[in-house]
């Protein structure tokens, strides 16, 4: 128990409170000079309130002359007035609220403006305009003149144009050759969008690719493939998807054929492929061509948006990605590759086919805005030369670097990103793993060493249990508020992020900073500690150490290429915190003497303490500015760069499923937190005026997010259309989209209102819905109205069937003749009582169909004779061709679907053989029909932007779609739902 008087206790308490504040001078009492426990630190991080008190201390308390003389003598080394210049430097660059606030505001503005400026700069076309760009733009105009899906006459016209262009270019050089490809392929294609699906879809496809080979000077080198597809979907002109890729390839070919261009060292093969949109088939059939045998590397050009910059978002390995560092305007990020791999983006490109065939290469694509992708807004009107040149010039630089140089054999996965479109950074995942391990060990060791030095020298007075919980508690509260508000946005209207991700990002970032400011400022006021920013930096560094450890495990287990930013954050926080510790470790210890008696009454004690504060204010340190510059600007730049890129890529995926919407909002919240996290070490020193501004910004941004239109012309709602024609003459229109948004569009259609047509809407899984109504009948082929009746467009005949119900343990053989007038592709689906294609009653049961055949030669309208009834025993697994030219595919696991694509318009008939086994273990005692095989034949038509001549009168092919396009609101766009825009379906039982 203390024997001191209350006044002594008050003075000691005041002194202790002062010691635990933010002093920077070491002081000791004359009463006990050698007692280390009496030392304390006066922090450089002075409060502005102390500045205000500086002018008042002259008049504060009339002390006795003797006492005043003692105080002055003890502090005379610190009482000299600094020069005007020194005071200017201190007021401008000291750790003051105004200075810090200005630095924070400038950092955020810098990051936003510099990103926009450099993006604009990267789209500038050099002057004069390159000749290959001028020609490529003309090519693009011709290619995207009409909507040209695979099953359209316009598709043939595009094919002929590309073939003519390439042949004319090839004619200028003896080592360039161009040809049309007529290869065929029959293969098993898994579900492209669901890796867990066990569906086996057998596809027969006839190629209409256009191939060009530029022979290199060294035939021993493996060839480079450059690829893009020239077909569009049925509802789009395909200007960006993928006309720009085709036009870029033609421009590159023009450059290679130029008389000033040297012949490349390795062969460069161009694959202008067809039918990518419905199954990546043009890339798949390429491997049936002999030129594919020599190909080892590839560059795939795609378009999943409608302009902007073309991003390199996937690469197979470090060796191949290293060559991208030589392009003139790099734009790439492996974060998108991880998002693609993780299912955040539901699309696929030919990259997948080439990579699965063991090729090494990259995927370059346009990526925004996704809501215009596959709609008629993807047209030449919405395109520009700048976007075309960005893809063409970068692809040209990459192709030249790969074609003229040796290629690194580093096959390890790579992380990569660009810096403002000026520099390209890449390194292997193995090297990142090593770097992370090194940092996880080195940084803690350095921190501990410096902390021990600081503790020994008593230059940082902070208790082991005091002040260390404010950062985690405040951060948890801030993240909780951000999460709650983000969830409120989501539940209020999940579609708001589809139109605009920037406004809610501003709202959530402002909210995070406000809550953090309140929490940390309150903690600093209640329990002030010496150098709070350093304490928070160390805690932030510890948090990032854990995150880096997790990211390192992800690298080892899953080859995750998207978490590289965590390593950057850890490095930045480490540099900033280590610098703070180093500054304390090297700081000289200055001592002042306190009077021996702290128990005198009156204002003497208060005067001494006030003079101590004045002295502290005159010992300035500017290490905060270095810490700020090491941490905040680069952190914000990294976060905004990959965060903005990611949000632009995924924000409109909410229209595809609620699950993707959840991911989008979570990612939005994560970016908002990351944008605020780097400022937390300094946030308690922000000017209160800025917090008011942040509150206003948060309120305005939230209001704009909640009350603004969900969709607009630039960010429309996307609905998907298909029309089914039934044998009974029904013409059902199916419109698919987000549940609740379809009905208003259908309600306003003239045919629905005038004819009082009923429609039914069904809520499907994952927030989607489908509405069905009777639409205007389609006119699919030229001729008479009778020729457009169902029975004259699609007929399915059973030519033979061995399922008599008597044989049990041998395969059944059935032959079908399918006549589909002017349809280029038909899909066969199979079902029994226990199995249905795509929706098996028992998901563990194999499909009954074991073999499908496509006959090209017939004998008396029947297939050629087989050796005996045990056909399955004589056919190898997989694809084979018999002596009659019949394509056969056998799969013992069972075949779920069979898709037949053809290229000849006049070849209306498909002849298909099916061999199947009934599962007799499930034999029913009921009707014989329980042992039958059901076959659904569905044939598609994709042309709509054309007319059919019906009995001498021109009629639009699919008027129901025309009506929907014409009367849908300006903020609604229409895309295709299925393989075509209309289909006919017939069911037979074997």
From Swiss-Prot:
Cofactor(s) essential for the protein: Zn(2+)
InterPro entries in the cross-refs: Fxna-like_M28_dom, M28_fam, Peptidase_M28, PFF1_C, PFF1_TM
Principal subcellular localization: membrane
Start-end of Low complexity biased regions: 53-63
Vacuolar side stretches: 119-433, 492-501, 556-565, 647-662, 712-990
EC identifiers of the protein: 3.4.-.-
Pfam families per the UniProt record, alphabetical: Peptidase_M28, PFF1_C, PFF1_TM
Co-factor binding comment: Binds 2 Zn(2+) ions per subunit.
UniProt entry tagged with the keyword Zinc: yes
Presence of keyword Electron transport: no
Regions crossing the membrane: 98-118, 434-454, 471-491, 502-522, 535-555, 566-586, 626-646, 663-683, 691-711
Keywords annotated in UniProt: Glycoprotein, Hydrolase, Membrane, Metal-binding, Metalloprotease, Protease, Transmembrane, Transmembrane helix, Vacuole, Zinc
Places the protein is found: Vacuole membrane
Protein residues bound to Zn(2+) 2: 241, 277, 374
Binding site for Zn(2+) 1: 229, 241, 302
Sequence ranges on the Cytoplasmic membrane side: 1-97, 455-470, 523-534, 587-625, 684-690
Membrane topology listed for this record: Multi-pass membrane protein
Active-site residue list: 276
Record-linked CDD domains: M28_Fxna_like
One GO-annotated biological process of the protein: proteolysis
Stated family: Belongs to the peptidase M28 family.
Full protein name: Vacuolar membrane protease
Native source species: Komagataella phaffii (strain GS115 / ATCC 20864)
